[in-house]
């Protein structure tokens, strides 16, 4: 299946149903009074995270989602039916952005999580609501309010503990194949990896972590060179980044300059991402003898001003890989994810005596005069007292 990590959609909540103007007409009850019912609330539009999905490709073709309108009120104090909600299922890891405001509405980070993205309109009031001691035959009603309408940008961001950084052909995919059951394509030409992939690294029966491989970066990626930086967003939720450096590039490029390019492109994309913990990992040390590899790695680290620990591995032969993975596992255990508090979603209600309806009644009351019935030509026929 084609991997699609961005999609734009339109969501429209249902309008509220209008209130009804009606009077009770029944045999032997000549002055039945008002019995117009309220309208129904409009349906809402929800997002729901589904772990069985792994791409947004469906929303490249289906771009509009509309909830049902609330039914109008009816006579005999019948309230209109509430409009049906629409639920849009997205992969776990999807970020929802309002394109109109640029606001991030929410991150769908766990299976079954729901997010309200468009609220249905409020119902209108029937004329029964406007009955009072001075207005026995009200002919007022209110219409339902429009539902929310939004253009949303959906961004799928892979949920991984560890992210891989590096130039094309640095050995990122080979590393993923060596430590997990994932089988990304590996070849001796740049940009073999065209889409992100995930691998689960199992250290033992109880300990494991997820590593993400993204296409390599080149100079000018922030301006769109190569595959650009569109895949860097998949590293935003990672707890640690492994910066793979080809210690002996086959194309004769300078490893120090290659590393600086990656750091520069990372900073151009996001200062927050650049500030994440980043480990230096020298790959392909099997191409050199042990002493030469150690000396070259030390020289590169000094040229980069790197003072922390660095690792020497060979993803192809497995040399040094296990020790690196155990250190990563220890780091992940010692630095658990801080879960953001999930926003409480409003509950569905069939009727809510809210500020909107209260304001509508007050506006009608202000327009009434002290002698309401004299302004109503047919009012005498409907006035009654107990």
UniProtKB/Swiss-Prot annotation:
Binding site for GTP: 166-173, 191-195, 213-216, 283-286, 314-316
Binding site for Mg(2+): 173, 193
Organism of provenance: Escherichia coli (strain UTI89 / UPEC)
Role: An essential GTPase which binds GTP, GDP and possibly (p)ppGpp with moderate affinity, with high nucleotide exchange rates and a fairly low GTP hydrolysis rate. Plays a role in control of the cell cycle, stress response, ribosome biogenesis and in those bacteria that undergo differentiation, in morphogenesis control.
Alphabetical list of PROSITE patterns matching this protein: G_OBG, GTP1_OBG, OBG
Cofactor(s) the protein needs: Mg(2+)
GO BP term, example: ribosome biogenesis
Keywords carried by this UniProt record: Cytoplasm, GTP-binding, Hydrolase, Magnesium, Metal-binding, Nucleotide-binding
Biased composition (Polar residues): 129-145
Top-level lineage group: Bacteria
Protein family: Belongs to the TRAFAC class OBG-HflX-like GTPase superfamily. OBG GTPase family.
GO terms under cellular component: cytoplasm
Region (Disordered): 127-147
GO molecular function, one term: GTPase activity
PANTHER family (UniProt xref): DEVELOPMENTALLY REGULATED GTP-BINDING PROTEIN-RELATED, MITOCHONDRIAL RIBOSOME-ASSOCIATED GTPASE 2
UniProt name for this protein: GTPase Obg
Annotated Obg domain residues: 1-159
Gene assigned in the entry: obg
Pfam families: GTP1_OBG (PF01018), MMR_HSR1 (PF01926)
Main location as per UniProt: cytoplasm
This protein's record includes keyword Transmembrane: no
Quaternary structure (record): Monomer.
């Amino acid at each position: 299946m084609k991997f699609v990590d961005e999609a734009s959609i339109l969501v429209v909540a249902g309008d509220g149903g209008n209130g009804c103007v009606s009077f009770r007409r029944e045999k032997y009850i000549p002055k039945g009074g008002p019995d117009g019912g309220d309208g129904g609330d409009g349906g809402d539009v929800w997002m729901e995270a589904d772990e069985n999905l792994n791409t947004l490709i469906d929303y490249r073709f289906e771009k509009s989602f509309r909830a049902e309108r609330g039914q109008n009120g009816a006579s005999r104090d019948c309230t209109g039916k509430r409009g049906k909600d629409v639920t849009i299922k997205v992969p776990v890891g999807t970020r929802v952005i309002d394109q109109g405001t640029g606001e991030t509405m929410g991150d769908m980070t766990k299976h079954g999580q729901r997010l309200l993205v468009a609220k249905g309109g409020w119902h209108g009031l029937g004329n029964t609501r406007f009955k009072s001691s001075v207005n026995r035959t009200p002919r007022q009603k209110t219409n339902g309010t429009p539902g929310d309408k939004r253009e949303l940008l959906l961004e799928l961001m892979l949920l991984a503990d560890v992210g891989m950084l590096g130039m094309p052909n640095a050995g990122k995919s080979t590393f993923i194949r060596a430590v997990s059951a994932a089988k990304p394509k590996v070849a001796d030409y740049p940009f073999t990896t065209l889409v992100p992939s995930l691998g689960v690294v199992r250290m033992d029966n109880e300990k494991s972590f997820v590593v993400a491989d993204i296409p390599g970066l080149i100079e000018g990626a922030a301006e769109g060179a190569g595959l650009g930086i569109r895949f860097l967003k998949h590293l935003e939720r990672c707890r640690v980044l492994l910066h793979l450096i080809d210690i002996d590039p086959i194309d004769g490029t300078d490893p120090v300059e290659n590393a600086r390019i990656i750091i520069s492109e990372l900073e151009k994309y996001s200062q927050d991402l650049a500030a994440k913990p980043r480990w230096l990992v020298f790959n392909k040390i099997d191409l050199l003898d042990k002493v030469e590899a150690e000396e070259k790695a030390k020289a590169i680290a000094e040229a980069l001003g790197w003072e922390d620990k660095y690792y020497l591995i060979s993803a192809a032969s497995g040399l040094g890989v296990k020790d690196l993975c155990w250190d990563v596992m220890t780091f992940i255990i010692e630095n658990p994810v801080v879960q953001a508090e999930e926003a409480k979603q409003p509950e569905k209600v069939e009727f809510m005596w809210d500020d909107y309806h209260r304001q509508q009644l007050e506006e009608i009351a202000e327009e009434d005069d002290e002698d309401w019935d004299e302004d109503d030509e047919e009012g005498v026929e409907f006035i009654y007292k107990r």
